[in-house]
Amino acid sequence: SLTELGIGSAIIFALYMPIADNDEEKIASLMRIYKYAYWLIGSVIAVVGVAMIPFLRFVIGDAPQIKENFYIIYGIYLFNTASSYFFTYYSALISAYQRNYVVIGTSYVITTLQSIVQIVLLLCCKSYMPYLIVQTVGTQAYNVIIALKARRDYPYLKRRDAKPLPKEEIRGLFRNV
């Protein structure tokens, strides 16, 4: 995503050496920064998205072909997009450990189930709203499952005492973005 601005790649790159050295404290410190960065991005997306609501009717104009309330559809999309940023650092850590098969496998199962349910709902209901809700539930289910797997496999992520990184190292991270 454009809003990610390469932060994920820079931090995953920064994780490789501490992972190779099994330096859990450094990994926890990097993940703290990663979590903060993504929470900030997700929050900015949510705030800007909510601030845009009064202007949607000017951007969209009249949309007579849409039966459902456009503002509700927009709100669901906004929630789905912004909330995903609050979990993405977990999948990045799993990928940095070169266990991307966990991320891909989980995504495959959730996407397959989601698609089946969405097709059935479209055939039965002929409405976009249930389709969109299932998409959001699928995204949230994926995020929660990946977060639970990461927290189970890497319990040091729960540490509250991870030392902050030195400012020079943080600057180096942002130079790599």
Show where each model-derived region lies:
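Transmembrane-helix boundary and interhelical linker motifs in polytopic inner-membrane proteins
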Residues: L2-A37, Y90, S95-V102, A162
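Membrane-interface helix-loop junctions in multi-pass transport and translocation proteins
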Residues: Y101, T112-V144, R152
